[in-house]
Amino acid sequence: MKQFLDFLPLVVFFIVYNLYDIYYASGALIVASALVLVYTWLRYRKVEKVALITFVLVAIFGSLTLYYHNAEFIKWKVTVIYSLFAAALLISQFVFGKPLIQRMLDKEIHLPARVWNNLNIAWALFFLACGAANIYIAFWLPQSVWVNFKVFGLTGLTLVFTLLSGIYIYRYNNTH
């Protein structure tokens, strides 16, 4: 259910874009994201930091898109979010000395430090690559291509990378 809720605003964005335009879709994305955040809080009495940060960026970039009637703002949101994710991963590892992925998962999964480091860097590079791909597709290809990439391409890439990470973790997990 939680994964469906996380994906719901993206589905709303895609549907509204195809029915109307990028501006209605941006407004719908803001509203759907806010509703999911409220529902999550009411249902679980907790909202993850990533969800809150993502919502704030959706609200900011979506509002700028609507206010200035300029789709470039909503297109930048994806790259900004992915860049923040990459920065958080790299800062946790190189400044604070413990990979963020390890902080999130080490209660359930036990891996050697080298594996946590590799996994953390791999995800940071993945997010940077997705952010760079977003810039290219958003600003050099038609808007409809970008919308499909945002909804299906990035989602598919993330699922594949998650699966590959799971395989990598399974190879080194000390609990199996």
Curated annotation (Swiss-Prot):
Tree of life domain: Bacteria
Keywords linked to the UniProt accession: Cell inner membrane, Cell membrane, Membrane, Transmembrane, Transmembrane helix
Transmembrane segments: 22-42, 50-70, 81-101, 121-141, 149-169
Subcellular location: Cell inner membrane
Main localization of the protein described in the UniProt heading: membrane
UniProt keyword annotation of Transmembrane helix present: yes
InterPro entries membership: YciB
Membrane topology: Multi-pass membrane protein
Any one cellular-component term (Gene Ontology): plasma membrane
UniProt xrefs under PANTHER family: INNER MEMBRANE-SPANNING PROTEIN YCIB (PTHR36917:SF1), INTRACELLULAR SEPTATION PROTEIN A-RELATED (PTHR36917)
Assigned protein family: Belongs to the YciB family.
Record's function text: Plays a role in cell envelope biogenesis, maintenance of cell envelope integrity and membrane homeostasis.
Name used for this protein in its record: Inner membrane-spanning protein YciB
